[in-house]
């Protein structure tokens, strides 16, 4: 266990590169093919661990977490457990609904908000009665399987803490940087972090990089967003935030805002360059938001963070929303249903 990310197992054992992650998934695909050839598992060609499946699993976890009133930090930990596990184990070997339940059960223990095994099994059965067994020992067995595949490294560091530290630092150094994060901006950044767990970012980058990327989307791209909306009404973004009961307001960033940004990354490419960061916004006057952008760029310049990693995180988050816009829950649900119900026949 480590209170410091830089000496933690998360960084030293579980922070991957894109190449190593791709190689791990390639090896898993080869193993899956061998298991199918040897008759250990059946082949379901439509079952893939792609972005659509990850969005579906994310939504399952949120549904179960809300029934149990689980803290957001435990949900985030459960998502990373799930991502790590599915690097090593094929979807075609397991019950994904039991995986979601087990990840949340283990995460609640680690994040010191434990749920009784009978309660979490009962709530999961209420949601997915055809997939969750009544026997609680099945969940306990899966927990050992999960921990083994993660090499027993369970303690995690999340961007939420980094986000709050940045907020506090900006407040304390307002005289130097001349701006701070508003409550709305903090909430927007927090919600973006929630959604970022669908991606591979938490296997690839340090938490503070992801936190800065979400602030960048909220602060810097907000000016582009306002020009891209063209007066259109925005849908509410149904994600778990700092306060799940807070209704979105007109300043909130929504999925279609990020969708528009996914088709044109000029603002992303300007990161770290305060002068060019404002010229692309249709020659707007230096209003309050533009001044804030320049001040945030100054903070970024002083922070000495890896800007290439920040750009990488921003692009992944925006791409996620582009995929989410085309997401079809029923198609993913049907594919998993066919696999799990046919397996039990």
Curated annotation (Swiss-Prot):
Protein origin, superkingdom: Eukaryota
The residues covered by the Cyclin N-terminal domain are: 23-147
Entries under SMART domains matching the protein? CYCLIN (SM00385)
Give one GO biological process term: cellular response to heat
The UniProt keyword set, sorted, is: Activator, Cyclin, Nucleus, Repressor, Transcription, Transcription regulation
Using the UniProt record, give the first listed, main subcellular location.
nucleus
Molecular-function GO terms, alphabetical: cyclin-dependent protein serine/threonine kinase regulator activity; RNA polymerase II core promoter sequence-specific DNA binding
Q: What does this protein do?
A: Component of the SRB8-11 complex. The SRB8-11 complex is a regulatory module of the Mediator complex which is itself involved in regulation of basal and activated RNA polymerase II-dependent transcription. The SRB8-11 complex may be involved in the transcriptional repression of a subset of genes regulated by Mediator. It may inhibit the association of the Mediator complex with RNA polymerase II to form the holoenzyme complex. The SRB8-11 complex phosphorylates the C-terminal domain (CTD) of the largest subunit of RNA polymerase II.
Subunit notes for this chain? Component of the SRB8-11 complex, a regulatory module of the Mediator complex.
Family per UniProt?
Belongs to the cyclin family. Cyclin C subfamily.
Q: What is this protein called?
A: RNA polymerase II holoenzyme cyclin-like subunit
The protein's organism comes out as Debaryomyces hansenii (strain ATCC 36239 / CBS 767 / BCRC 21394 / JCM 1990 / NBRC 0083 / IGC 2968)
Lineage, please? Eukaryota, Fungi, Dikarya, Ascomycota, Saccharomycotina
């Amino acid at each position: 266990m480590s209170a410091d990310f830089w000496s933690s197992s998360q960084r030293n054992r579980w922070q991957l590169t894109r190449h190593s992650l791709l190689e791990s998934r390639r090896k898993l695909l080869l193993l899956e093919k061998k298991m199918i050839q040897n008759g250990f598992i059946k082949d379901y060609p439509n079952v893939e661990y792609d972005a659509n499946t990850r969005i579906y699993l994310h939504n399952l976890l949120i549904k179960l977490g809300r029934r149990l009133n689980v803290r957001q930090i435990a949900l985030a930990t459960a998502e990373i457990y799930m991502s790590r596990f599915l690097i090593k184990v094929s979807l075609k070997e397991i019950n994904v609904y039991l995986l979601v339940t087990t990840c949340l059960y283990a995460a609640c223990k680690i994040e010191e908000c434990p749920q009784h095994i009978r309660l979490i099994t009962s709530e999961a059965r209420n949601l997915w009665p055809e997939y969750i067994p009544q026997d609680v020992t099945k969940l306990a067995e899966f927990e050992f399987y999960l921990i083994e595949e993660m090499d027993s490294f369970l303690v995690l560091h999340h961007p939420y803490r980094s986000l709050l530290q940045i907020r506090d630092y900006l407040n304390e150094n307002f005289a130097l940087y001349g701006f701070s994060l508003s409550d709305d901006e903090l909430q927007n950044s927090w919600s973006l972090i929630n959604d970022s767990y669908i991606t591979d970012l938490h296997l690839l980058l340090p938490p503070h990089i992801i936190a800065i990327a979400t602030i960048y989307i909220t602060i810097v791209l907000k000016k582009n967003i306002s020009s891209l909306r063209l007066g259109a009404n925005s849908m509410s973004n149904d994600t778990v935030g700092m306060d799940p009961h807070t209704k979105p307001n007109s300043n909130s960033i929504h999925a279609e805002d990020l969708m528009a940004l996914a088709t044109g990354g000029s603002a992303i490419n300007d990161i770290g360059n305060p002068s060019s960061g404002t010229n692309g916004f249709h020659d707007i006057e230096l209003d309050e938001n533009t001044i804030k952008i320049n001040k945030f760029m100054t903070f970024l310049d002083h922070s000495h963070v890896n800007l290439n990693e920040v750009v990488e995180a921003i692009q992944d988050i925006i791409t996620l929303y582009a995929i989410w816009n085309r997401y079809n829950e029923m198609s993913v649900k049907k594919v998993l249903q066919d696999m799990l119900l046919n397996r039990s026949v």
